A protein has these predicted regions:
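Glycine-rich catalytic cores of cysteine/serine-nucleophile enzymes that process amide/ester linkages
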Residues: 3-91, 127-133
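A structural motif
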Residues: 77-82, 91-125
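Structural alpha-beta junctions
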Residues: 27, 32, 41, 106-112, ...
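Activation targets extended, charge/polar-rich intrinsically disordered C-terminal tails
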Residues: 116-184
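Solvent-exposed, acidic/flexible segments
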Residues: 27-30, 97, 138, 142
Length: 184
């Protein structure tokens, strides 16, 4: 499986194989969006948009220990944003899911509206045909790649679901659960 290669805001190149995005909604903050990327070696690179989270750069990327991040900030984040919090997995290497992704009604809200406008701007523009302001230096992806999201990808309540309880499930187990759910 080939990775997606991305240039991180003028800092360095990374290759990553999947991404999980968490969304949290509350009356005070209608949209609180962030994501983290799974690397081949098991490490993670995180991105935070909309609001600052302690330990992460605003609107940029940092490398971090995923388990430690969740241990330190998950409780605070859940309390801040209320009950509507979930993780959605996106497979960035499977073109077969592109058709489902194109039918996703939440495309504009979940992808174009927040963190991904700059991060995947070039990819969205070239593959999906959405016009947008973008800096081509941010992303370098081959034409064979596609950012995809299954229309029926389940939503995960990260506080109530046993499969996505970050306090007790390791990152590797989490990714296995998300892959399994996407394949069903």
């Amino acid at each position: 499986m080939k990775p997606i290669r991305m240039y991180l805001f003028g800092t360095r190149w990374i290759d990553f194989y999947g991404v999980a995005i968490w969304f949290a909604q509350s009356r005070k903050w209608p949209a609180h969006v962030g994501c983290y990327f799974a690397m081949e070696d098991g490490s993670h690179v995180g991105f935070q948009a909309q609001h600052k989270v302690p330990g992460m750069k605003y609107g940029g990327f940092v490398s971090f220990d995923f388990a430690e991040y969740q241990k330190r900030y998950h409780g605070w984040k859940a309390k801040l944003t209320g009950k509507k919090m979930w993780v959605r997995y996106i497979d960035l290497t499977d073109d077969q899911l592109l058709a489902k992704y194109l039918k996703c009604k939440r495309l504009e809200r979940d992808v174009l509206g927040y963190a991904h406008t700059q991060v995947f701007g070039k990819l969205i523009h070239e593959r999906l045909g959405f016009p947008m302001q973008r800096d081509p230096r941010y992303v370098d992806c081959s034409e064979s790649m596609a950012m995809v999201m299954a229309e029926d990808t389940p939503e995960y309540d990260v506080r109530d679901s046993e499969n996505t309880n970050f306090d007790s499930v390791s990152p590797s187990e989490l990714w296995a659960n998300l892959h399994a759910a996407l394949a069903e």
